[in-house]
C-alpha cells in the first residue's frame, strides 16, 4: 500500500490535476494567437488609390495595471481580486501600411500597436505565479495548494468549463427518418478556422444519392454536385466512389439525373446550382455565386479554392460509399456515444474561438476607421484607427457572462470555493452540448469507452445527470497535433498520401 501511495504521489508531482487546462492555454498563447493573425493576413480597405494593412507578429506582455495617474506597474492576482480588476496582459501587434496598388504599391513604416487586453489563466507561462516556490506564492498572497487554471475577471474568479463535442472532419454513418421514410446518411462536421459546416450524403429509398451543405437550399443530387466540382465524365464519378459492389447503383444515379435534368457537363451543373443559390440573377452572377458556395461552404476543411475541387470529389465519393455500405449491410451505424468520436474543447480551444471572433470585430472596426479618416481628408493613421476596447470588451464580456461564440451559455462559471475538492472537481468538469430538457437516454448512460477517461460516479442528479461529467482522476488529455508532420513522415516511408 505504501508503494502505491508513493507511485500516486510521484505521478501527481509530474502531472497536476489541472495540467490539461493550463497546457491548453499555454498552447493558445504560444501558437494559436499568431495562427489567428496569420489567417487574416491583411486588412483590405476601399480607400481610393489603394491602402491596406499587413499584419505581422503578435507580442504578449506580462500582467500589468495602468493607474489613474498614467503609471504602469505589474499586478498580482491577489491585488486583482481585492480591487475588482481583471488580471490580464496587453497585446501588441505589428502592422505595416501598404500604400498604392499593383506594382506601384510600397510598404510604409512598421508600427507596433496596442490592440487590447487578454485575460491571464493563473499558473500559465505568462502569469506572475508561474514557476514560483511555496514560500514565494505565500508572499504573493496565494495558497500554495491552489490548483490554479482559472481567470480573474473584474475581481471574480472564473473557470472555463471543458465542452464535449463531436469529432470534426470525420465521416459518421447513421440511419435517419425523412418524411416517414428511412434514409442512410453519411455526415461530416467540416471545420476550418472556427467555421463549422454540416455536410451530408444520403441514399434515399428510390436508390438516388443526395447531398446537403450550408449555403445550398434543400438537397442536391450527388451526381450534379460532383459534375459541378469538375467530374467531367461518368468514369470520374464512378472512380471517385471506387467500389465495384456499387457499380450499378452509381450508373442508376447517373442515368436518372441525365434523363430528369439533362445535365451533361460541369457548366450545366454549375448553372443548376446557380439557379438554386441566386435565383432571378444574371447568368454570370449565378455561376460566380455557385463557385463561391462550393469553395467556401462545401467541405471547407479540404480547402476554399477551386484547386481543392478534386479533393472534394474524392471525399464525397468516400461519403457516398459509406452510405451505400450502410444500406447494403456491409457496415453498421456509428456509435455517436463512443469516445473515439468525441473531442474535449479545453480552455485554450474556447479562448481561440473567442479571440478569433473578437479579433474579426477589431479588423472590421480598423477598416471602418481608416476609411473614415480619408473621408475627412486626413492621412490614414493606423495608431489612431485601432480602438483597443473593441477586443478587450468583447473578451471580458464573454468571460464575465459565460455567453460564448455560437450562442453557447454557461461556458464561463464562477469558481466553486465551497471546498478544495469542489474546486478541483469544477476545474476537471466536462459538459455535453445536448439539451437538458430532452431524454437522450443513450447519451446519459455510461459507455464502455468512458473507462479510464470519465469518472463513472461523479455526475449530478436531476436533468444534468449523465450530461455533466468529470474526468477520471488519472485521465490525461492530449493536445491536437499538426497533421502535416505525420503526412511528411508517411511520405518519407514511401506511402502514397492522397
Curated annotation (Swiss-Prot):
One matching Pfam family: RNA_pol_Rpb2_2
Domain of life assignment: Archaea
Catalytic activity as recorded in UniProt: RNA(n) + a ribonucleoside 5'-triphosphate = RNA(n+1) + diphosphate
Uppermost EC category: transferase
Keywords: Cytoplasm, DNA-binding, DNA-directed RNA polymerase, Nucleotidyltransferase, Transcription, Transferase
Localization terms from the record: Cytoplasm
SUPFAM superfamilies in the cross-refs: beta and beta-prime subunits of DNA dependent RNA-polymerase
GO biological process: DNA-templated transcription
Family in the record: Belongs to the RNA polymerase beta chain family.
Subunit field text: Part of the RNA polymerase complex.
Protein name (record): DNA-directed RNA polymerase subunit Rpo2N
Organism: Methanocaldococcus jannaschii (strain ATCC 43067 / DSM 2661 / JAL-1 / JCM 10045 / NBRC 100440)
Amino acid at each position: 500500500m505504501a508503494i502505491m501511495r508513493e507511485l500516486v504521489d510521484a505521478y501527481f508531482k509530474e502531472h497536476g490535476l489541472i495540467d490539461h487546462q493550463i497546457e491548453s492555454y499555454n498552447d493558445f498563447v504560444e501558437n494559436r494567437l499568431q495562427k489567428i493573425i496569420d489567417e487574416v493576413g491583411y486588412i483590405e480597405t476601399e480607400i481610393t488609390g489603394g491602402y491596406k494593412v499587413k499584419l505581422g507578429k503578435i507580442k504578449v506582455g506580462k500582467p500589468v495595471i495602468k493607474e489613474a495617474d498614467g503609471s504602469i506597474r505589474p499586478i498580482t492576482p491577489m491585488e486583482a481580486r481585492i480591487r475588482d480588476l481583471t488580471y490580464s496582459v496587453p497585446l501588441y501587434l505589428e502592422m505595416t501600411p501598404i500604400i498604392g496598388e499593383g506594382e506601384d504599391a510600397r510598404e510604409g513604416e512598421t508600427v507596433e500597436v496596442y490592440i487590447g487586453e487578454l485575460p491571464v489563466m493563473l499558473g500559465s507561462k505568462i502569469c506572475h505565479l508561474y514557476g514560483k516556490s511555496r514560500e514565494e506564492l505565500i508572499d504573493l498572497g496565494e495558497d500554495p495548494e491552489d490548483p490554479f487554471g482559472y481567470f480573474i475577471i473584474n475581481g471574480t474568479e472564473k473557470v472555463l468549463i471543458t465542452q464535449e463535442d463531436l469529432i470534426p472532419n470525420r465521416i459518421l454513418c447513421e440511419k435517419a427518418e425523412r418524411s416517414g421514410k428511412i434514409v442512410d446518411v453519411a455526415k461530416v462536421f467540416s471545420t476550418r478556422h472556427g467555421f463549422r459546416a454540416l455536410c451530408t450524403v444520403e441514399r434515399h429509398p428510390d436508390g438516388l444519392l443526395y447531398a446537403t451543405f450550408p449555403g445550398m437550399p434543400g438537397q442536391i443530387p450527388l451526381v450534379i454536385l460532383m459534375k459541378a466540382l469538375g467530374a467531367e465524365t461518368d468514369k470520374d464519378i464512378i472512380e471517385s466512389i471506387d467500389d465495384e459492389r456499387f457499380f450499378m447503383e452509381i450508373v442508376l444515379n447517373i442515368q436518372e439525373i441525365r434523363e430528369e435534368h439533362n445535365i451533361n457537363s460541369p457548366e450545366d451543373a454549375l448553372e443548376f446550382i446557380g439557379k438554386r443559390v441566386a435565383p432571378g440573377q444574371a447568368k454570370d452572377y449565378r455561376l460566380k455565386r455557385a463557385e463561391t458556395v462550393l469553395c467556401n461552404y462545401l467541405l471547407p476543411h479540404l480547402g476554399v479554392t477551386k484547386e481543392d475541387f478534386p479533393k472534394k470529389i474524392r471525399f464525397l465519393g468516400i461519403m457516398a460509399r459509406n452510405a451505400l455500405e450502410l444500406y447494403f449491410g456491409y457496415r453498421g451505424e456509428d456509435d455517436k456515444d463512443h469516445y473515439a468520436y468525441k473531442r474535449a474543447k479545453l480552455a485554450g480551444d474556447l479562448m481561440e474561438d473567442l479571440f478569433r471572433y473578437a479579433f474579426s470585430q477589431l479588423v472590421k472596426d480598423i477598416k471602418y476607421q481608416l476609411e473614415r479618416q480619408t473621408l475627412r481628408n486626413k492621412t490614414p493613421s493606423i495608431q489612431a484607427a485601432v480602438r483597443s476596447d473593441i477586443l478587450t470588451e468583447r473578451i471580458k464580456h464573454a468571460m464575465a457572462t459565460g455567453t460564448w461564440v455560437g450562442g453557447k451559455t454557461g461556458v464561463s462559471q464562477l469558481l466553486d470555493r465551497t471546498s478544495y475538492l469542489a474546486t478541483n472537481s469544477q476545474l476537471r468538469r466536462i459538459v455535453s452540448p445536448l439539451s437538458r430538457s430532452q431524454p437522450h437516454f443513450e447519451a446519459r448512460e455510461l459507455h464502455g469507452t468512458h473507462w479510464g477517461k470519465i469518472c463513472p460516479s461523479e455526475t449530478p442528479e436531476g436533468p444534468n445527470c449523465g450530461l455533466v461529467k468529470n474526468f477520471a482522476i488519472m485521465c490525461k488529455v492530449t493536445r491536437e497535433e499538426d497533421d502535416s508532420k505525420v503526412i511528411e513522415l508517411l511520405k518519407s516511408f514511401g506511402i502514397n498520401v492522397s
